[in-house]
Amino acid sequence: MNMIGTFIKPMHPEGRKFVAIFAAVTFGLFLLTPILGWIGVGLTVWCYYFFRDPERVTPARPGLVISPADGVVSLIEPAVPPAELGLPDVPLTRVSVFMSVFNCHVNRAPVAGEVTAVAYRPGKFFNASLDKASADNERNSLAIRMEDGRDLAVVQIAGLVARRIVCFVKPGAQLGRGERFGLIRFGSRLDVYLPEGVSPQVEIGQTMIAGETVIAELGTGVHTDQNKGELHG
């Protein structure tokens, strides 16, 4: 039973209708030819895998910022948070996590706190690994106010394939660290804007696990630009 659980993960409810559609199309393909039917089976399994929602063990130690997404760190650089959040117009350290179509796309809160703002903005669909995706692509931004009064911003960004951002929370909601707050369908990116003076503890190219990998400690010092760069994928 444990071995089965290793390979078969729970599926997020957002994926049920997509798997149902893939399964229905697969049935039709089998009526045409078994070869197409088996291709449909493979695509249906992939769709189920894409919407998997495994449990995660979030570190309990206070003062940690946790990755909101599975994927790879593609950018670390200073940037001003999205204007629609109403945060101060001050550059903060932005850590970007790029998710391929093979990553789990359920998004988790990097810190615990109150959601003070949720702002959706339509946009383009450039490759999410590019720097300009933060400014130009469709996005949904959240501001989270922590217990100490500091704010952290996390931004869901649609990518070249992803065309649908889903957010489960509204302003006033209380989030626990590692709690699910949304997902992005079929490839995308998450940006985390660390509070002023907080340094990231990750590097470009590092693999991230949502709800588990530590991005930063809230007590760390000022960030330098030595890690600034870009990863193309």
Curated annotation (Swiss-Prot):
Keyword Lipid metabolism (UniProt): yes
Keyword Lyase applies: yes
Protein name (record): Phosphatidylserine decarboxylase proenzyme
Gene that encodes the chain: psd
Enzyme class: lyase
Topology relative to the membrane: Peripheral membrane protein
Quaternary data: Heterodimer of a large membrane-associated beta subunit and a small pyruvoyl-containing alpha subunit.
One Gene Ontology biological process: phosphatidylethanolamine biosynthetic process
Catalytic activity: a 1,2-diacyl-sn-glycero-3-phospho-L-serine + H(+) = a 1,2-diacyl-sn-glycero-3-phosphoethanolamine + CO2
Domain of life: Bacteria
Disulfide bridges in this chain: none
Subcellular location: Cell membrane
Required cofactor(s): pyruvate
Pfam families membership: PS_Dcarbxylase (PF02666)
Residue(s) carrying Pyruvic acid (Ser): 188
Enzyme Commission number, as recorded: 4.1.1.65
